[in-house]
UniProtKB/Swiss-Prot annotation:
Cystine connections: none
Similarity comment: family membership: Belongs to the CbiM family.
Pathway noted in the entry: Cofactor biosynthesis; adenosylcobalamin biosynthesis
Any Gene Ontology CC annotation: ATP-binding cassette (ABC) transporter complex
Cytoplasmic domain ranges by topology: 30-42, 96-106, 155-159, 202-222
Domain of life (superkingdom): Bacteria
Annotated InterPro entries: CbiM, CbiM/NikMN
Protein name, per record: Cobalt transport protein CbiM
Lineage, uppermost ranks: Bacteria, Pseudomonadati, Pseudomonadota, Alphaproteobacteria, Rhodobacterales
Periplasmic side: 1-8, 64-74, 128-133
Function recorded in the entry: Part of the energy-coupling factor (ECF) transporter complex CbiMNOQ involved in cobalt import. The complex confers cobalt uptake upon expression in E.coli; can also transport nickel with a very low affinity. A Cbi(MN) fusion protein has about 70% import capacity, but the holo-Cbi(MN)QO complex cannot be isolated, suggesting CbiN may destabilize it.
Length: 222
């Protein structure tokens, strides 16, 4: 998913950075409030960031000029809400760009918009809808992580198509081509990420009722 350094036109790089900015600011405010009101949630915040860092660093090269990998943002999104992952995701992407040459500084805004904003918002929305539909916590978390991951790659496909539309079929044709290439590796990875996220939630929360697990992780219950 990480679009490599210098791959996007300058105007696109700036535009995606400006689009991501307000979400990151809102996330910083949310994190500050969480830490002030629930200091015990700091460990889970750190674990959410580490989970995203490790999973999104497992990259599989793709011929689209990007790569495929799990995103790991679903965990933090379902526990703390999507705005928190905007900040954690940017930190993850920045470290990966500087230390692993994964992504880049000029494409940080675009990568953040797809992985740290769209993915977490979709994951959070799916989790809420699944819960209201009567799904168990495990099913809701799985669907959230699975669809949040896929939403990230759909967004990246659209970003790449906007930058490089197909000469014949235009934006839609390019988006379908980028998306189809990602899908070969990403659908299996998204399924695996869904199962792994459920396992991690269970491991971090311990042996408590499903309805209390996320509240405990978020520092809202003891």
């Amino acid at each position: 998913m990480h679009i490599m350094e210098g791959y996007l036109p300058v105007t696109h790089a700036i535009g995606w950075s400006l689009a991501a900015g307000p979400f990151v600011v809102a996330g910083a405010v949310k994190i500050r409030k969480i830490v002030a009101e629930r200091p015990e949630a700091r460990m889970t915040l750190a674990a959410s960031g580490a989970f995203a860092f490790v999973l999104s660093a497992l990259k599989i090269p793709s011929v689209t000029g990007s790569c495929s990998h799990p995103t790991g943002t679903g965990l933090g999104a379902v526990v703390f809400g999507p705005s928190v992952m905007a900040v954690l995701g940017v930190i993850v992407l920045l470290f990966q760009a500087l230390l692993l040459a994964h992504g880049g500084l000029t494409t940080l805004g675009a990568n953040a918009f797809s992985m740290a904003i769209v993915g977490p918002w979709v994951a959070w929305g799916v989790y809420k809808l699944a819960g209201k539909a009567g799904a168990s916590m495990a099913v809701a978390v799985f669907l959230a992580a699975f669809l949040g991951d896929l939403a990230t790659y759909v967004t990246t496909s659209l970003q790449l198509a906007l930058a490089y539309p197909d000469p014949v079929s235009g934006f839609l044709g390019a988006a379908l081509k980028f998306g189809s290439v990602f899908a070969l590796t990403q659908i299996p990875l998204a399924i695996a990420e869904g199962f792994l996220t459920v396992i991690v939630v269970d491991a971090l929360a311990g042996k408590v009722d499903d309805k209390d697990k996320l509240r405990i992780l978020a520092g809202e219950a003891r």
